[in-house]
UniProtKB/Swiss-Prot annotation:
Its main location: nucleus. Residues 246-395 are annotated as: Interaction with PRMT3. GO terms for biological process: protein localization to nucleus. This is Zinc finger protein 200. Gene3D superfamilies: Classic Zinc Finger. It is found in: Nucleus. PANTHER family: FI01424P, ZINC FINGER AND SCAN DOMAIN-CONTAINING. The gene is ZNF200. Residues 169-181 have a biased composition (Basic and acidic residues). One of its GO terms (molecular function) is zinc ion binding.
Amino acid sequence: MMAAKVVPMPPKPKQSFILRVPPDSKLGQDLLRDATNGPKTIHQLVLEHFLTFLPKPSLVQPSQKVKETLVIMKDVSSSLQNRVHPRPLVKLLPKGVQKEQETVSLYLKANPEELVVFEDLNVFHCQEECVSLDPTQQLTSEKEDDSSVGEMMLLAVNGSNPEGEDPEREPVENEDYREKSSDDDEMDSSLVSQQPPDNQEKERLNTSIPQKRKMRNLLVTIENDTPLEELSKYVDISIIALTRNRRTRRWYTCPLCGKQFNESSYLISHQRTHTGEKPYDCNHCGKSFNHKTNLNKHERIHTGEKPYSCSQCGKNFRQNSHRSRHEGIHIREKIFKCPECGKTFPKNEEFVLHLQSHEAERPYGCKKCGRRFGRLSNCTRHEKTHSACKTRKQK
């Protein structure tokens, strides 16, 4: 018997993040000009440009859904793994990290038709979804390793490599560029930049992009676990306060029972149940209450105010709960109403028993239509009407 052949599953593509910058934009030129200053300068430069896209704190409400250019792209490599990125202009490798594990690169695509523009993605996130800051991270040291910055922002797509190619190298088109790439891999520095071979290529990048597919926005991705101290170096604290996630909401815990509240006023009101404090007194009878709402309900007894009225009959009530209970009676009346006597019932069981009582009161029923009568004479008189109708139809 032939043994079953086990076929190994192909490895899943690594999830990465991407930053696409128009080559003719100011950020693209600054990245090429300041590339020799190291990876930290590039991160700082990107975040400074991201800061210019954010609205002013005075013009933004914390609860408003704002579309920002900060977009989280968790599955970029799975959707773009088959695309080819020719001519990588800037290649960034962090020091002390293996190339196949931590590769941070910037690709300025030479082919405008291969550009994946912001309109094609159609992914928008509000400020609360863009940057989430864990409150436990606010106590981290400012001397945190710079590797968190490298993990925070990836400027390339680390997709699957073609067969037969070195995973540490990117595809090239000519021999001159292949020689430059091999020299770059041998250098110990963390940053190597190359320029396009001619000016025609640069002009084509700037002029041949279709108008409908022009990249208008800067896409930056930042991990949710970015430390607050690290992010505050580039972004204003007031803006960070606007972009905090719901998970950073402070909870106020009662020390006696452990119950939590999201507002301090709720905690203070709750603690009065433990202490027995009643700071609200009635001006008419002097009775004390621990909540202001309970005092308002009590004062309506003295004033006779009934602000809640029934929408069916117009009856007024002092409390909204009393009105709701009363309106339920009208609803049940419409459902369980006897067609014989017009009596209403709050429950279906009572309504069925009432209908059976009508049947017991009328033991004589017509064999033709099923109508019931309390007396036999009335039933026989009714049955004659059916026989009279038949004789008329026969004539």
